[in-house]
Amino acid sequence: MAQYYTTMNLKSRFAPSPTGYLHLGNARTALFAWLAARGAGGTFILRLEDTDQQRSPEIYERALLEDLRWFGIDWDEGPDRGGDHGPYRQMERLAVYGRYYAHLQSSGQAYACYCSADDLAAERAVQRSAGKAPRYGGRCRHLDAAARAEREAAGLLPTLRFRVPDQGTLTVPDLVWGERHYALADLGDFVIRRSDGSPAFFFANAVDDALMEVNLVLRGEDHLTNTPRQILILQALGLPVPAYGHLPLLLGADGQPLSKRYGAASLRDLRKDGYLAAALRNYLARLGHHYSATGFLDSRALAQGFALNQISRAPSHFDMVQLQHWQHEAVQSLDDAAVWNWLAPLLRGKVPMGLEMPFVAAVRANILLPGDALDWAERCFGAPALAADAVEAITGVSPEFWSVAQATLQASGGDYRRWTKALQQASGRRGKALFMPLRAALTGLTHGPELAALLPLIGEERALARLHAAARRPSTPIETTL
Ligand SMILES: Nc1ncnc2c1ncn2[C@@H]1O[C@H](COP(=O)(O)OP(=O)(O)OP(=O)(O)O)[C@@H](O)[C@H]1O
Ligand SMILES: [Zn+2]
């Protein structure tokens, strides 16, 4: 397969249009391209394809850079930091495209087309009714200078079309899909410059990759059919052709590809919800790429384990359960101080000063998102609501049990082991029968972190008050032991 880079000079890129907030599909495509570059010690660049001016307000550009950085992707060249092959915003490169248009026109490989949208629609309708695939029939291919001048004088603004060779087959290698063959006669001459002077996607994208010395293009499968046209443009201009790999699109729950246009869940939404970038990286890196390591990997290990031949062709679906699995792993990979930094914006003022680290140590295995930690802070330091099964666990034991629980707690000076040992001896309860009602009364839940770690946070005073409140609930006498 054509592949002219060695791992030493590999250069890949992410080239989004700043037309909305990045979604997980964009993020995964960016991640694969970045992992390929970083894994090979190559170069990674960011280029903004902002030629759709109506849909590219500045807020999206800023958000895009911010989201990528948060996600953990860095770039060696880009709109914010420049580089040897800039500028990195396509709207700043119009003069560059102009030179290449002129070259194609003067060598006869591109020509002005004056057909109106109505003309083209009519042509397509005829082709369709004849059972043919619609393509440009070449009406303006052979206009002479006089005919062109006449149309210009009438005020018609032409598009510029690429002249596709009439015969032959183009072989397009793809790192994911293998080789595909295209009959050139089927392609039809295509627009490379719109009538308003703006570059067509195919053109600017292909020219920029070549001029920026990108030799590996990993992008979404939505661009698969653009590739033959792009290779034709590059060949006509004598520019190098990169290796292409098209990644299966990430689909939403409705089975449709995620798209900025249709408001797919964005990276920034997940960030706001408290998902960690490392969780998203581990999740997305494995979505359509096989790693032999099944555990949590840091960015360096993800890059080292990345291999183009491990990319799958199967479509991938966004799966919240998988994301939560990696979120759990990512939280556990942090040390206590880092967990606190992550929680602090939501928890400041909710955890008494000095108890931050013991609190983190106690609850960290039980939290996926900062909201979970907020709930545990309320259960430790506030007034926890009792869940229905906790009420059941509390009322399932006699009021005497609760009196003894209070007395033994006081006698043990708040020491968890001494307390529960004494209570076990006095009540005859052990194991779950002992700990479940205690947990229910102290936290309002029947599950959660180790009680031994929670008790010092709750403190003796609050614990006594909660045991006292438990004693005041009418018991459902199902047992006679204390
Ligand atoms: N659902 C998806 N799954 C994987 N990659 C995607 C998906 N959608 C887009 N991409 C890829 O993300 C990169 C950036 O694309 P682009 O900025 O055009 O995003 P988009 O979501 O297609 O936006 P729009 O809806 O504005 O077309 C491209 O390589 C594109 O192929
Ligand atoms: Zn025409």
Curated annotation (Swiss-Prot):
Note describing how the cofactor binds: Binds 1 zinc ion per subunit.
Residues annotated to bind Zn(2+): 113, 115, 140, 142
SUPFAM superfamilies cross-referenced by the UniProt entry: An anticodon-binding domain of class I aminoacyl-tRNA synthetases, Nucleotidylyl transferase
GO CC terms: cytosol
Molecular function via GO: ATP binding; glutamate-tRNA ligase activity; tRNA binding; zinc ion binding
Motif 'HIGH' region location, chain numbering: 16-26
Keyword Aminoacyl-tRNA synthetase in record: yes
Family annotation (PANTHER family): GLUTAMATE--TRNA LIGASE, GLUTAMATE--TRNA LIGASE, MITOCHONDRIAL-RELATED
Quaternary data: Monomer.
Protein family according to the UniProt entry: Belongs to the class-I aminoacyl-tRNA synthetase family. Glutamate--tRNA ligase type 1 subfamily.
The protein, known as: Glutamate--tRNA ligase 2
Organism: Acidithiobacillus ferrooxidans (strain ATCC 53993 / BNL-5-31) (Leptospirillum ferrooxidans (ATCC 53993))
